[in-house]
Amino acid sequence: MVQDSAFLAKLMKSADTFELKYDFSCELYRLSTYSAFPRGVPVSERSLARAGFYYTGANDKVKCFCCGLMLDNWKQGDSPMEKHRKLYPSCNFVQTLNPANSLEASPRPSLPSTAMSTMPLSFASSENTGYFSGSYSSFPSDPVNFRANQDCPALSTSPYHFAMNTEKARLLTYETWPLSFLSPAKLAKAGFYYIGPGDRVACFACDGKLSNWERKDDAMSEHQRHFPSCPFLKDLGQSASRYTVSNLSMQTHAARIRTFSNWPSSALVHSQELASAGFYYTGHSDDVKCFCCDGGLRCWESGDDPWVEHAKWFPRCEYLLRIKGQEFVSQVQAGYPHLLEQLLSTSDSPEDENADAAIVHFGPGESSEDVVMMSTPVVKAALEMGFSRSLVRQTVQWQILATGENYRTVSDLVIGLLDAEDEMREEQMEQAAEEEESDDLALIRKNKMVLFQHLTCVTPMLYCLLSARAITEQECNAVKQKPHTLQASTLIDTVLAKGNTAATSFRNSLREIDPALYRDIFVQQDIRSLPTDDIAALPMEEQLRKLQEERMCKVCMDREVSIVFIPCGHLVVCKDCAPSLRKCPICRGTIKGTVRTFLS
């Protein structure tokens, strides 16, 4: 400590008027911590202190007083300042230093002797405070050069390890990593740095520690499972590499929070809560949008929970599902069972342009009549361009459902209408292609999700298809190189792309290799397609089986159906399988919304 330093004792004796500040922002105080620093370290204590480091007392490990960066294992030729600047360039202390100013740099500015007798060592100004660059022996008579670091926080009590906030810094800690089956690169990418003993690692953000790794473990998955509230995971959860993102520039929490600089002071929901829930501020009123699903919300009220509103209006948002989970979304949806009911009935009923406009409900106390919705200048302009009224109505309804407001400009509406037309054209082309398909290909396409889940004998199927020349050796290898969980889906997609001949070979191969699955996909279709009038002619057991099958999820073939797809209205999957689908497995129509149902 300072009191035990002979040099500092001499200094204070010869410069009684100096007020020495006892904290690590003072270089002299940092220097005093090196009294027990190991003698064999090839880096001088003075250069370490000058670079912002104080001695921790453990081996040759030092720590920056400002950013918390910890370094050890010093080697010949190491420059503390350069390593500090390289590993943590955003450190406030590093940023305040002029790289040209060092002990060997240009001569230091002199201070008048009168100033020397009155200026405290911890003197703070915008340019000079607490940065000592004089020599030991000449300090009492030589001037002192000061630099600003008052912006640096005190030593943080947060678990966040600033030193390890880059993947590169974390990777450097795995020099003695003992395991071969789990790569340091994956651990570092998942936020972990190595602390030992054994295979023990810690997260730089939440300080969560894990050990006893097994071969099947995935670093990122284990991190999420054990420490779901980790701030690093929350930001990572917003990464575009994990799911489709509507606005890439808003994928980080920091980017979203910056948009709230002009957030109305009268707003009833805190900006931090909105940013955490994936929303960024559009700059208008209290309108916010999700960076992932592009869903918009407005008119916030006291007590509103951004996560609940997100799950209420946009239950299929991938960011929402990743962060909060399907169970949370299902609970929220269960509280609003009739939210999309009227929209569904509107989609299923025939369009009558002369009929009275329907009312689409968007929340308690909020409604919008079609007659008003279709009377705005923007909508009228689109109608005058020749777009069909039914297409305009449907497009505007979905815009209001997704964002809570009508189109503001004609150009935006026209873009939406053109996209809707492209989507309709694509669906028509798919439907036409399916009509030309053989029965085998149509059945494989229709039951694709069932095959994804239940086709386990992929390798034998590959060899059968290869010997029948239904697929090429290159296509066979492409399937085998996929992870085990993706091989079935890749094989089915390959067969569907190859066409009728490959589908026939697939059917014949499946009959030999998995007769039970073959019956479910191909044989039982004859019974399923019987007219309703003919069911009574079936045996009682078959009637019961058919009734049970009607209530069974067509994807997992296990749980009861409970989700109605919008706009097609098909009720064919359970609440657990619905989020993974983008098109209805029955009609192949694009799923634009879902409604939870409860069968009695």
Swiss-Prot record:
Any Pfam family hit: UBA_BIRC2-3
Main localisation: cytoplasm
Catalytic function, reaction form: S-ubiquitinyl-[E2 ubiquitin-conjugating enzyme]-L-cysteine + [acceptor protein]-L-lysine = [E2 ubiquitin-conjugating enzyme]-L-cysteine + N(6)-ubiquitinyl-[acceptor protein]-L-lysine
Protein name from the UniProt record: Baculoviral IAP repeat-containing protein 3
Subunit details: Interacts with PRSS25; the interaction inhibits apoptotic suppressor activity. The BIR motifs region interacts with TNF receptor associated factors 1 and 2 (TRAF1 and TRAF2) to form a heteromeric complex, which is then recruited to the tumor necrosis factor receptor 2 (TNFR2). Interaction with TRAF2 is required for ubiquitination of IKBKE, degradation of NFKBIA and activation of NF-kappa-B. Interacts with RIP1, RIP2, RIP3, RIP4 and USP19.
GO molecular function: transferase activity; zinc ion binding
CDD domains: BIR, CARD_BIRC2_BIRC3, RING-HC_BIRC2_3_7, UBA_BIRC2_3
Post-translational modification: Auto-ubiquitinated and degraded by the proteasome in apoptotic cells.
Keyword Transferase: yes
